[in-house]
Amino acid sequence: MINLTNIKEYKDNKELLKEIKEEFKNSSDLIIKTIKDIDVIFLESLCSSDKINEYILKVLSLSKKKIKDLNNILVGPNTKKIKSKSEITNLLLNGFTIVLGNNWYAVETKGDLVRSVTAPTTESDLHGPKDSFNESIQTNLGLIKRRIKSPDLVNIDMDIGLYSKTKVSIIYISSIAEVSLINKVKNKLNQINIDGILDAGNIKQLIGKENRSAFPTSQLTERPDKAAADLLEGKIIILVDASPLAISLPS
C-alpha cells in the first residue's frame, strides 16, 4: 500500500508517481497523462473519459499561464484536496482522477456503467444485481472493479488472433489465486495460434481442447457479481473484447 507520508514531506511528485505505478503495476487500465507539468492519473475502466476531458484535461490545456493553484481551475462538482498519500489508492479505486501539481487534488470522474449494461438474460437471480456484462471489455472490467476495490486485483491484457488481434484480459486476485493456476492459464493462452477470436466461447473451447485431465474445466458467465465471487474464491476470470460473457476457471 502507498504509505502515510504527508504531501509536505515531498519535494516533487516523481517519487509518488513511482509508488503509484508500482502499486498498480498489474492494472493495465492505469493511465497517467502529463500536461504542463501537471500529472493526471486514473483507472480507465472506472472513469468517464468525457468527465476527465471536461473537468480536467480541457481546462489544463486551455490555461495560458503556469498553473500555480489547481483549485482555481478544476471544475469537477466533487473535487477534494488530498492531504496524504494514503488516500490515493482508495480514491483511484472509487473512480476519482488524481491531479498532481504543487498540491494534490482528486476529482470524481466515475463512469456511469449502469447505463451501459442490461439485466442478465440466462442467469437471472431475483435477489441479485440486475447488471450483466456487455460487449465492451473496458466496461466489463469496470463492473468487476466496482465490486473488488483492491490493488491486488490483477488484470493482464494480451492480443490473440493473427488477424483479429482480439483483446483478452486475465483477471485474478494476486493474494488469493494459486500461482500454479495463474501460470497455467497464461501459458495456455500464449500457446493459442489462430486467425481470429470472435467471442469468449472460442477461448473456452481452445483452452480446454488439449490436456483435459491436466487443465481445469471452465464455465461461461454473464454476471459480474458471479465473476467477482469466483475471484474471491481464488478462481481466474478471462474477459474477451466484443463478448458479453466471461470465462471462469476452474469451474
Model segments located where?
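Membrane-embedded alpha-helical signal segments
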Residues: M1-S251
